């Protein structure tokens, strides 16, 4: 009987060794340098190892994984119901039943004996060492007992893998007088110089591939790409940096395997995406860029309930295989659709000429060919999105992605629950940290700040959803605009808000100038979420409304400055507000009233006159509006309507 004809019951009887391959310290590997080309190359290299080299090795041992075929057939199906109807059949056609999943730097599969498992683990570790130096991979296997359930084995192997990771990894000491450090990372020994470039590259065997060696064109392209990076300042680089440059170049020129998110987005945009951008290309206004880091919520609780819903091993194994594909598809599909929609609306306004061998590529008329500056997709897969966007699109992209991802995962859970007597009460959402920072901010600092904001958003989700038992959860988003100090302590900075605006209730989080973190599905229109925080959509719409009316942000600053002035009484602030309003146009006053309902609030009160209790509740998100005012684009359709109404 062929492997395809076997049932999951057969697979579990014959294969009692579970294997886990896990790439660890991924963020350290990707963000070891601040050069965008190397970060891009590191990300693509990890995708290449996970989607090409690991399946290649598994195929040698009879385990087939046709990821390219799977993606082409079902990742672009628009209708969720159709996708979910076809996913089981397509997975069984393209993925060996012994493979639980391969993706997001990890792999989990079953084999018949421990010797085979150890051979595979050894070979995978060796290919990582050869092709992705400094990448950290843990490969472990677990022999299941005769009557041990697959979910128990998964938990046991996870514990074994965690123990292995806790042992750490050997570190090379390069802090020695004679050691020459890599000029790009500063953390590895330099082994490649401009003077001896070709010899040095040959010595580190950079032209090797998993199945042999690169062809002459690939060798030439690699040498040229590395030369272009190091020749300007005659720098010396490490093997790791050289490999990252190689794979950054490979992603642009030689993506024959069509792996990773770039292969999806460039097709969606009809190849109008610049693949060799610099960080400055994403700058908006006073050199600000947007950094987005989103991560799935509730996966742990969701998967705990899977064991209660799918009580047989066969059902459980089948579901887990499907779940990993659906999670990855929804992440990539939604991000693609969000970007495509914004692209079609003309929101990506910047274009950049294409270079080849240092020269501009020309069209038939002799003019430079330009492509759109869209984004740098550093991590997209599983439930993670880590990307750089133009600063005036980052918050809106994140919101739209989180909202649509949440809707897709909710739909999936509903359809699964309809099939089963026992229901999974959890739903998977996404929480995100968005950093708006200067383009000179080191990338690792952007990542660290994004992670802190993401954790803040997740904490708010936990806090607000813990009392929503049996109700649909929603994700959250936190954001921060950072000036020249990329390493600012956001938590300490925000304490000033508590101390300044809410001395009596500082532990309750009522800031009265900010409502961060915001929910994705808020309480404004949806009764299902009436007990959660205000949504980020409301804030975005407020800013767009102000910008459509050409409301000056200097007047928003006046209101904010008045809010933070604790030398004035409540009545004095109201009087000064009236004075500020008297200098505004009727249209400006109308928009303030529409957004904050000031008409019925600007009343003097002579009770407790010396206590600033009333005014602090006015404009309770004014700092959020002020901070992102320059980082939300005005909708073109709204602008055109305003122009038509004004007779322009």
Task: Label every model-predicted segment.
Residues 1-648:
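Regulatory and interdomain segments flanking nucleotide-handling catalytic cores
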């Amino acid at each position: 009987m062929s492997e395809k004809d076997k049932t999951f019951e057969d697979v579990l009887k014959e294969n009692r060794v579970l294997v886990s391959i896990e790439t660890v310290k991924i963020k350290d590997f990707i963000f070891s340098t601040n050069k965008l080309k190397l970060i891009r190359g590191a990300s693509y290299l990890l995708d290449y190892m996970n989607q090409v080299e690991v399946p290649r090795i598994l195929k040698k041992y009879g385990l087939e994984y046709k990821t390219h075929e799977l993606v082409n057939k079902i990742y672009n199906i628009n209708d969720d119901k159709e996708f979910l109807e076809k996913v089981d059949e397509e997975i069984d056609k393209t993925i060996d039943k012994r493979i639980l999943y391969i993706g997001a730097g990890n792999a989990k599969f079953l084999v018949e004996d421990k010797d085979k498992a150890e051979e595979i683990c050894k070979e995978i570790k060796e290919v990582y060492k050869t092709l992705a130096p400094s990448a950290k991979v843990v490969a472990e296997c677990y022999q299941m007992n005769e009557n041990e359930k697959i979910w128990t084995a998964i938990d046991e192997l996870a514990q074994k893998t965690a123990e292995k990771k806790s042992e750490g990894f050997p570190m090379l000491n390069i802090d020695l007088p004679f050691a020459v450090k890599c000029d790009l990372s500063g953390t590895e020994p330099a082994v490649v110089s401009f003077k001896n470039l070709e010899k040095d590259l040959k010595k580190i065997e950079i032209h090797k591939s998993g199945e042999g060696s690169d062809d002459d064109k690939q060798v030439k392209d690699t040498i040229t790409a590395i030369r272009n990076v190091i020749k300007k300042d005659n720098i010396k680089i490490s093997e790791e940096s050289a490999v990252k440059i190689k794979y950054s170049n490979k992603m642009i020129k030689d993506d024959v395997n069509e792996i990773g998110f770039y292969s999806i987005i460039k097709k969606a945009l009809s190849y109008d995406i610049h693949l060799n951008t610099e960080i400055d290309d994403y700058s908006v206004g006073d050199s600000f860029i947007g950094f987005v880091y989103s991560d799935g919520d509730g996966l742990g609780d969701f998967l705990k309930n899977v064991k209660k819903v799918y009580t047989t091993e066969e059902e459980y194994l089948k579901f887990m295989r499907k779940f990993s594909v659906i999670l990855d598809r929804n992440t990539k599909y939604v991000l693609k659709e969000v970007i495509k929609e914004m692209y079609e609306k003309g929101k990506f306004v910047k274009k950049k000429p294409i270079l080849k061998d240092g020269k501009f590529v020309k069209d038939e008329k002799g003019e430079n060919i330009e492509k759109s500056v869209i984004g740098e997709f550093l991590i997209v897969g599983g439930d993670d999105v880590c990307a750089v966007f133009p600063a005036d699109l980052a918050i809106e992209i994140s919101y739209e992605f989180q909202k649509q991802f949440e809707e897709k995962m909710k739909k999936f859970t509903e359809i699964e629950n309809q099939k089963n007597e026992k229901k999974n009460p959890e739903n998977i959402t996404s929480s995100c940290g968005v950093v708006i920072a200067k383009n000179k901010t080191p990338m690792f600092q952007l990542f660290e700040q994004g992670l802190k904001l993401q954790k803040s958003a997740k904490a708010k989700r936990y806090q607000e959803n813990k009392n929503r038992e049996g109700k649909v959860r929603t994700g959250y988003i936190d954001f921060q605009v950072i000036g020249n100090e990329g390493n600012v302590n956001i938590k300490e900075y925000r304490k000033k808000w508590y101390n300044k605006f809410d001395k009596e209730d500082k532990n309750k989080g009522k800031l009265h100038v900010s409502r961060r973190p915001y929910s994705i599905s808020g309480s404004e229109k949806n009764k299902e979420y009436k007990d959660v925080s205000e949504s980020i959509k409301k804030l975005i719409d407020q800013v767009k409304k102000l910008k459509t009316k050409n409301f000056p942000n200097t007047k928003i600053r006046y209101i904010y400055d008045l809010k933070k002035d604790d030398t004035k009484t409540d009545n004095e602030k109201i009087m000064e507000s009236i004075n500020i309003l008297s200098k505004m146009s009727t249209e400006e006053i109308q928009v303030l009233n529409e957004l904050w309902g000031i008409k019925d609030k600007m009343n003097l009160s002579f009770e407790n006159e010396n206590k600033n209790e009333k005014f602090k509740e006015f404009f309770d998100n004014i700092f959020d509006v002020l901070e992102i005012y320059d980082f939300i684009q005005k909708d073109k359709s709204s602008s055109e309507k305003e122009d038509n109404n004004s007779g322009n």
